[in-house]
């Protein structure tokens, strides 16, 4: 699953996706029925193309007042399901809920806030994307999460440049208004 996302070689991608499938099945066989089991089952359904069924299961789980850690996993998995359906606004909403839970839980090695930043940047919200990526980068450094730091630093220069251009444009407009106001 997740490791395969970082591979280029198609054969290796298939090998690691196969291993993820085996591990997912093993988890389902060894965990007791409950929320954690159902989250893994929903992930399996998504991989098998049964996104609607996964959404129904995850939304039902979300309504049962799970603890904060479980709620974070449910919302993150819901965000992934909405991504598969192309429902970006719902994906953003669920990533925001996940990021809030991560922050409340004290998690510093997370993916939700940076994924949220990418989506907000794509929607033109450069300010929030910049703030969220900066926070993600600071947390990745603080907890020595090399992979998360690497992920953030791949995209940060793009957002940083857009943010600085926006700030410069704002300064230019303010100076122009001050100049014309002085006459």
Where are these regions (language model features)?
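A "functional boundary" signal
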Residues: 1-172
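Selective detector of the "anchor" transmembrane alpha-helix that sits immediately C-terminal
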Residues: 176-183
């Amino acid at each position: 699953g997740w490791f395969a996302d970082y591979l280029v070689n198609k054969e290796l991608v298939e090998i690691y996706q196969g291993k993820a499938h085996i591990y997912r099945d093993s988890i389902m066989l060894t965990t007791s029925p409950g929320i954690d089991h159902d989250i893994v089952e929903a992930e399996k359904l998504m991989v098998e193309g049964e996104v609607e069924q996964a959404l129904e299961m995850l939304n039902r789980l979300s309504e049962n007042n799970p603890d904060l850690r479980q709620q974070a996993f449910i919302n993150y998995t819901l965000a992934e399901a909405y991504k598969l359906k192309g429902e970006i606004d719902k994906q953003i909403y669920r990533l925001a809920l996940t990021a809030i839970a991560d922050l409340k839980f004290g998690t510093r090695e997370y993916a939700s806030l940076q994924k949220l930043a990418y989506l907000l940047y794509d929607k033109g919200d450069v300010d929030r994307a910049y703030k969220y990526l900066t926070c993600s980068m600071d947390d990745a450094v603080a907890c020595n999460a090399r992979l998360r730091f690497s992920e953030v630093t791949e995209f940060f220069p793009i957002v940083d440049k857009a943010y600085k251009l926006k700030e410069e444009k704002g300064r230019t407009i303010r100076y122009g208004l001050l100049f014309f106001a002085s006459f």
